[in-house]
Amino acid sequence: MELKDYIATIENYPKEGVVFRDISPLMADGNAYNYAATEIVQYARDKEIDMVVGPEARGFIIGCPVAFALGVGFAPVRKPGKLPREVIEATYEKEYGTDTLTMHSDSIKPGQRVLIVDDLLATGGTIAATIELVEKMGGVVVGCAFLIELDELKGREKIGNYDYKVLMHY
């Protein structure tokens, strides 16, 4: 299946000069959505995953069906003020300024094998902060999976030596 057929390209969104890759058409097609999730599940099967972690909001959309198929739990990564219990934080650099991500402080147990799933790998800031959060709790990141990588933004450099899978490159 050619997954790029299910990605809408929107010029100058959310601001001038940006090309937005919209996964909504992929999610709206049951066969394409299932195919994408299954590709990530197949990547993860031999990694002995204990937990899937996904950053809001589209990491939830991809990560939850993957966790379900693997028979493991899902832990959300959110912006500050969105989780009701004690959290840990990781701050990362963006193009203009910084941003912070949080997780419940008991989301990951020491030694748990974690797969991080998100829709898009762009600059790598979100994935780097998510890796930091997992490792602060003693988790072991055994892989990262993305629907899309924007190659020119070089986000893979922030992943370093972590194993990862990308379904589509732009």
UniProtKB/Swiss-Prot annotation:
Oligomer and partners: Homodimer.
Q: Annotated pathway, please? A: Purine metabolism; AMP biosynthesis via salvage pathway; AMP from adenine: step 1/1
Identify the GO cellular component terms for this protein. Answer: cytoplasm
Which GO terms of type biological process are on file? adenine salvage; AMP salvage; purine ribonucleoside salvage
Role this protein plays: Catalyzes a salvage reaction resulting in the formation of AMP, that is energically less costly than de novo synthesis.
A Pfam match: Pribosyltran
Q: What is its EC number?
A: 2.4.2.7
Q: Tell me which family the UniProt entry assigns to this protein.
A: Belongs to the purine/pyrimidine phosphoribosyltransferase family.
Listed PROSITE patterns: PUR_PYR_PR_TRANSFER
Q: Give compartment(s).
A: Cytoplasm
User: Mind telling me what this protein is named?
Assistant: Adenine phosphoribosyltransferase
Catalytic activity annotation:
AMP + diphosphate = 5-phospho-alpha-D-ribose 1-diphosphate + adenine
InterPro entries in the record: Ade_phspho_trans, PRibTrfase_dom, PRTase-like, UPRTase/APRTase
